[in-house]
Amino acid sequence: MVSVSSGFKQRGSIAAVFRCIPFDIPSLDSLNVPPLLNTLILEKRGLILMVGATGTGKSTTLAAMLEQRNQQLAGHILTIEDPIEFLFSNKKSVVNQREVGRDTQSLQIGLKNALRQAPDCILIGEIRDRETMTSAISYALSGHLVLSTMHANNSYHALGRILSFYTPEARPALLADLAAGLRSIVSQRLVRATAGGRVPAVEVMLNTKLVSELIEQGDFSGVKEAMEKSMAEGSQTFEQDLARMITQNIITRDEGLAFADSPTNLMWRLQNDMNPISRVNAKKEESDDQPTFTEITLDVRPDNPSTRSASLTRY
């Protein structure tokens, strides 16, 4: 299916940008994304944000996640999109897709009426403003699974963008609600593969107890540090995923460095995490080369007739 992304006039002529959207929704396994996404989409409640730049495959990954839920769980999936991209058919779930301008007058009106339609899972096409963000958090706190996209470079930048929607007076209440309602922020970038085509590099921030406390305090730099030091259980940074793909020869080192948030951090991981077994063997070889003394014999001139040659054995 071909979708017109944008139509415009230039130099007196008509121009357009088209997007090719496949009819068949890909599976999560075929996209080379973390297996964790298979379980995240089956959650009963919470807010899951998919963030990244334009054209990084956010919509494709979200569609694959929704199809996973559609195939495995009975329920009602409601999408409010501008425009509709992937088309779903009912499987274990009933999927209703509403397009802004065609099925609902505006995104806000569609969201206002969403709870009356008894959804279990709600997909919001994109969060661009405070009103949409407030609705997404509110629905997550009321027991629904909410999915949406945002434009941000990574997880902690997404947190900063969410905060920027609100006035300083409203931010403490927002942070408390976000800490309680957020389930995960998934960031994605498309990287050229050595075998051709592109593969996603994925950062996952899970809202663990530690991350929740840091969000409530507004300490977003602390969230970044917790992820880098693997203190946020289940989370992974771009550098961790890029290092994995470089090690498995899925991408080149130069390509990984170009897409890393911190090339220095990625180089450190490649040097220290790639071959832990070889480092252990190297240490063992070094220890084998060192001189060892298992038996020491002391031959002492006896100043006292009672003094004798002593033999000391060390084990």
Task: Please report, for each region that a protein language model flagged, where it lies by residue.
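Short, flexible helix-loop junctions that flank or precede catalytic/ligand sites
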Residues: 1-315
